[in-house]
């Protein structure tokens, strides 16, 4: 048995030795059956090698990469102005393109060199110049607007919120040909990308742990970052804040007369649109501007978006100390009294006497008729009265039964529609015309004043008419009024020659001054001022010097 075992082992090794040549022969057969590389691959590699040859005149130098070829052309053939070898004409084959700057010629060389460093993040296509990539990205934006489906959850992001995709990713929004894929389920995750590439425009992080595509109910159809009006509102409020600071600075420097109604009106005009008195006053302008998030609802994914942004306004230099606030409050009180005293001049002096109606009271000021019979009798105009609103500012009330609308005193559509008999009962001073026989004017409801059909008094100068009206106002008023103070000759000319302020402007001025005083008083109440007062510059003290004794003889100075 022991003798048979050694003989069996060589028998078992024999097939193994016989199999080795067969494997070698098979491998040799497989190597022999491998097809040769195709001619198309060889042609492609040859064409790529030919594109890396410099064709500038007779250079014909070969380079390993497109970057090396581009650097060679820019440094060797184009040159630089500093080295005095700048060439602005392209000599690639027969191009002969001439430019005016070195940047232009280097950008033009990219057309000939197969260098495409600018790659599209959506489809992976490369471009030679950045302007070509920019035009290509616009085509993606147009396709996303035209081909977006109604069920697309990203529809509210607008055309500017692009997604990031790879050139070969199966879940990309665009395929290699630029067509939109139907698999839109892969775009529900906004913060990571399966292909590992970043998006062209990065998405903001979702605040408060909410969903990315949650749309607040009070916003428009655009996305959260595009529909947020915080920055534009802050700019407008900043402009109003600057106007308010300039106004307070002019008050401190006394650049206009607070006792002149014309000066006060002109100084308040820039603040009418900036203060927004009708929509909340100036309280919000003094404090910080904060866009608050919408109220929480029962929806679990509802988030406030990026609305929780704070915009802090800079400190107001003109209202820095307590002394500034008290001084400006006194000036505003003086301005308010000036506007309040000039309330009777609002309804236009060209249409009647400028002081025939006092807008501060319910009852008009009685004025006796003038001495002459050639002028109509003075009577109050049917202007509405002024009452105080909840905010302390005057408001307009509906017209009451101040006039009995009879056939003799019915207001016409304009001053031209009044009959001679009714003109005596109106507030317009015209010469009395002879009564025409026939029917009187039809009773209508309308205004007694017409801004278009303005007429001047005939037979008398305007200056004499104003003097007569002023005398009549002094004689008829229960309390004689003092002469209107004018701060400067320019203000006198403005008050006499220009059109008087309308009733709406007077009300707006009153509301503006009241809102400014509320702002100043609120700052004083809250203590929003610096405790350190400004150093007061005292005038220099004059001291008398003793008279020096004059010498008996004049002294000669040696030069």
From Swiss-Prot:
Pfam families membership: zf-C2H2
An individual GO BP term: positive regulation of transcription by RNA polymerase II
Sequence ranges of Basic and acidic residues compositional bias: 542-551
Biased composition (Polar residues): 375-391, 487-496
Zinc finger (C2H2-type): 52-77, 88-112, 118-140
Annotated stretches, region: Disordered: 1-47, 181-202, 339-430, 459-505, 527-559
GO cellular component, one term: nucleus
Positions of short motif YPX[LI] motif 2: 553-556
Keywords from the named record: Activator, Cytoplasm, DNA-binding, Metal-binding, Nucleus, Repeat, Repressor, Transcription, Transcription regulation, Zinc, Zinc-finger
Domain of life per record: Eukaryota
UniProt biased composition (Low complexity): 407-427
Predominant localisation class: cytoplasm
Post-translational modification: Activated by C-terminal proteolytic cleavage by signaling protease (probably palB/RIM13) at neutral to alkaline ambient pH.
Motif YPX[LI] motif 1 mapped to chain: 430-433
Alphabetized Gene3D superfamilies for the sequence: Classic Zinc Finger
One Gene Ontology MF term: DNA binding
UniProt keyword annotation of Metal-binding present: yes
Subcellular location: Cytoplasm; Nucleus
Family statement: Belongs to the pacC/RIM101 family.
Oligomeric and partner information: Binds to DNA. Interacts with RIM20, which binds to the two YPX[LI] motifs and is required for proteolytic processing.
Functional description taken from the UniProt entry: Transcription factor that mediates regulation of both acid- and alkaline-expressed genes in response to ambient pH. At alkaline ambient pH, activates transcription of alkaline-expressed genes (including RIM101 itself) and represses transcription of acid-expressed genes.
Protein name, UniProt field: pH-response transcription factor pacC/RIM101
